[in-house]
């Protein structure tokens, strides 16, 4: 489920005392699909993205739906639906756009305004390949692209390193202004480690420190309301750390996600 409640900032800018940024990592389609499937495991205990899932977790997000948990309270669901309207006018979700905008502007987690038919209409939209492809595209623009930009900035070379940054941004925020977000954790890790992979620090050791700092943020978050659910989700970080411990930096299938899931991804696909 989506847990990021601060306004979306799609830049991963961060001032670091480092030399010129390394090249942004290039991911092949199978690796990207694997990252999407890891998200499906973490979010829904599923092996592939769950585009039609919609639920109210009473966690401050309002309706949480789609493969990454687009939320009515945060504005990312509004962004998705507006893109869908542009590509496919008259779609089943278009009529909800004004209400989605109102909820996003207010940061409201109310689910009443959208009416009782909204969940069914979301599920209907999820049967449309245009909508599911947009879910992937928008999700990557919001969270994977900032992770790749940050990876290039700090010299991350491995697929698992990018996955760590991607998952943190997706769960805790990709923006420099978020007090628990991915850039904040990168900054604290850089200080604790005395540098980044770009300055010669071992990437595996660097991410071990990164994951320890991320868990500290999850156990005692400064993001309002997250103290109720983030402490229970640290197994997500522990599962990523185990992939490091097992030498799975390339994220090649078959890949077993440990922790409370113990699910093996054998055929990565969106």
Where are these regions (language model features)?
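Bacterial N-terminal signal peptides that target proteins for export
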Residues: 1-6
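Boundary at the C-terminal end of the N-terminal hydrophobic targeting segment
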Residues: 17-23
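Cell-wall polysaccharide-cleaving catalytic domain and substrate-binding groove, primarily
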Residues: 23-154, 160-270
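Bacterial N-terminal signal peptides
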Residues: 7-17
């Amino acid at each position: 489920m989506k847990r990021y409640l601060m306004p979306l900032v799609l830049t991963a800018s961060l001032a670091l005392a480092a030399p010129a940024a390394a090249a942004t990592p290039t991911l092949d389609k199978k690796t990207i699909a694997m990252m999407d499937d890891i998200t499906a495991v973490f979010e829904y205990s599923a092996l592939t993205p769950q585009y039609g899932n919609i639920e109210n977790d009473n966690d401050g997000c309002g309706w949480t739906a789609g493969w990454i948990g687009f939320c009515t309270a945060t504005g990312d669901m509004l962004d998705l639906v507006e893109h869908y309207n542009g590509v496919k006018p008259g779609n089943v979700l278009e009529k909800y756009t004004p209400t989605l905008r109102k909820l996003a502007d207010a940061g409201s987690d109310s689910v009443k305004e959208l009416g009782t038919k909204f969940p069914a209409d979301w599920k209907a939209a999820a049967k449309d390949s245009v909508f599911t492809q947009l879910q992937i595209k928008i999700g990557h623009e919001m969270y994977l692209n900032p992770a790749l930009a940050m990876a290039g900035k700090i010299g991350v070379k491995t697929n698992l390193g990018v996955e760590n940054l991607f998952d943190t941004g997706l769960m805790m925020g990709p923006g420099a202004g978020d007090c628990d977000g991915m850039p904040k954790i990168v900054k604290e890790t850089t200080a604790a480690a005395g540098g980044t992979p770009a300055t010669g620090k071992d990437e595996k050791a660097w991410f071990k420190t990164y994951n320890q700092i991320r868990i500290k943020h999850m156990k005692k978050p400064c993001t309002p309301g997250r103290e109720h659910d983030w402490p229970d989700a640290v197994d997500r970080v522990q599962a990523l750390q185990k992939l490091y411990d097992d030498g799975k930096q390339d994220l090649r299938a078959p890949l077993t996600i440990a922790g409370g899931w113990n699910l093996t991804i054998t055929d990565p696909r969106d």
